[in-house]
Amino acid sequence: MTYELHFKEEALAEWRRLDGSLREQFKKKLIERLAQPRVLSAKLSGHPDRYKIKLRSAGYRLVYEVRDGELIVVVVAVGRRDRNLVYQVAGRR
């Protein structure tokens, strides 16, 4: 079963500010994750149902939340990994 993709309002604004090539890379990975969103190696510790997608070469991260009851994946935050800022922002949302 495939999940639907949703964005938190703040995350959508961050998404729109991304360079087109970064968006395409994330989009490709998100399509894979909609089919299988719970990837154990990508689970965020201390945050139930939250996972990350990493673009190592660019240093960007995308944090998303899986809601099984509604069959949706919600993008919580998108940003550079610098000093784990994207993870801190996601923790506040």
Where do the PLM segments sit?
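Enriched for short, Lys/Arg-rich terminal
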Residues: M1-H6, E10-A13, R17, E24, ...
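Short, mixed-charge, low-aromatic patches
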Residues: L18-L22, K43-G46
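Compact soluble domain cores
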Residues: S21-A35
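A short, surface-exposed loop/turn module that caps and links secondary-structure elements
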Residues: I31-R56
